[in-house]
């Protein structure tokens, strides 16, 4: 049986190249971000990244903001980029034209990832119809209501955070980490996860497995 445990976060992200697309799970200011992997990716130095995330997280914390601060991101696809308070470095880069930004409603971002993992090319939704989100997208009417076409998302890599995992990569999530990790992992060609505890194979009960090891690299 394959042992999927890396010796260090640095080893886990060592192969991420310049120009890669990376989905980064995490919710809120810094809750359940894969902090160790984000720091390792910053130190690894890959540039021209396309990053998909709910948000970059708070500045000054070990979140995806670190990659923006290190000027490693060229394209950002997220549910939001700003928070109350002084502009973040990422926001300054967007205004200056150094960083392209696509806003995607939170639920739609997850569903586009889920569709990508399921092999579904796209779907129609009412969310965003009649707003700036709909610009340039196909519009069709269902039951008399406009729906816009949202294309599926697949990525080269996903970096995630879980609660526990066994050495085969079966993962248990806890709390808010269930929100994005599953869909992000399935949409990625390579999914890398950091956890609080590593178990031997068989120690994690089947009913506690939220993401099967087949989706983890």
List the predicted regions and their residue ranges:
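Conserved alpha/beta enzyme-core scaffold
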Residues: 1-217
